[in-house]
Amino acid sequence: MFDIGVNLTSSQFAKDRDDIVTRAFAAGVNGLLITGTNLRESQQAQKLARHYPHCWSTAGVHPHDSSQWQAATEEAIIELAAQPEVVAIGECGLDFNRNFSTPEEQERAFVAQLRIAAELNMPVFMHCRDAHERFITLLEPWLEKLPGAVLHCFTGTREEMQACVARGIYIGITGWVCDERRGLELRELLPLIPAEKLLIETDAPYLLPRDLTPKPTSRRNEPAYLPHILQRIAQWRGEDAACLAATTDTNVKTLFGISF
């Protein structure tokens, strides 16, 4: 099983990053996609992906950091994307929930990254929160020019999920679905996601599954907990966990064009 969303550059992993990766593979995880959320972290993610086996990375600017987007950023992302470890542009998209960057700054950076991905023939790794309508409006003209797209950490509605799937977008599911309160609506959507469009992720160190036992004293999520998320998703979809793992691995290879 492959974790498509690990924030391995996080300071929460600074002291034991080697152990985090070792535990993940010991738990049965067979690959990690390390998320880049701004230029500096994208550069760090690429170096980590080169350092660890069976790891890849993304290069891009998260909507929270969109105010940093400028011509030099674009040039650096394009240069970084040429590295073999970098297999997607992102994390890019819109987040109108907190607006750490203005909506205008977010839209400018999102469209710029869609253009880069199209020009480089690379998939996009996307984020959307409280911005679905505008997100789809900006994304749609680019979809036919992109080799693929995933909306990571999906927490939206049934209608939003169906709108994404209808456009060929992959859906990334995290341990959010394990939350006995916030995850209930998402849990009900799991059987409706086509198997060929489903991907799994931890978004570590964030979104520790709330039903994990025993809970780590640090309250920190890590990719070694991906098997727990996989088991829960399989349970709520009514399918075999091993089969689901194989299916999502195939989806990863198809979307990102990698072998593991």
From Swiss-Prot:
Species this protein is from: Escherichia fergusonii (strain ATCC 35469 / DSM 13698 / CCUG 18766 / IAM 14443 / JCM 21226 / LMG 7866 / NBRC 102419 / NCTC 12128 / CDC 0568-73)
PROSITE patterns: TATD_2 (PS01090), TATD_3 (PS01091)
Residues binding a divalent metal cation, per UniProt: E91, H127, H152
Origin superkingdom: Bacteria
GO CC annotation, single: cytoplasm
GO-annotated molecular function: 3'-5'-RNA exonuclease activity; magnesium ion binding; single-stranded DNA 3'-5' DNA exonuclease activity
Gene3D superfamilies for this protein: Metal-dependent hydrolases
Main location: cytoplasm
Subunit-structure text: Monomer.
Names of required cofactors: Mg(2+)
Lineage: Bacteria, Pseudomonadati, Pseudomonadota, Gammaproteobacteria, Enterobacterales
Family to which this protein belongs: Belongs to the metallo-dependent hydrolases superfamily. TatD-type hydrolase family. TatD subfamily.
Name recorded for this polypeptide: 3'-5' ssDNA/RNA exonuclease TatD
Record keyword Ribonucleoprotein present: no
Protein's job: 3'-5' exonuclease that prefers single-stranded DNA and RNA. May play a role in the H(2)O(2)-induced DNA damage repair.
Top EC category: hydrolase
Subcellular location: Cytoplasm
Transmembrane segments: none
Keywords: Cytoplasm, Exonuclease, Hydrolase, Magnesium, Metal-binding, Nuclease
CDD domains: TatD_DNAse (cd01310)
EC number: 3.1.11.-, 3.1.13.-
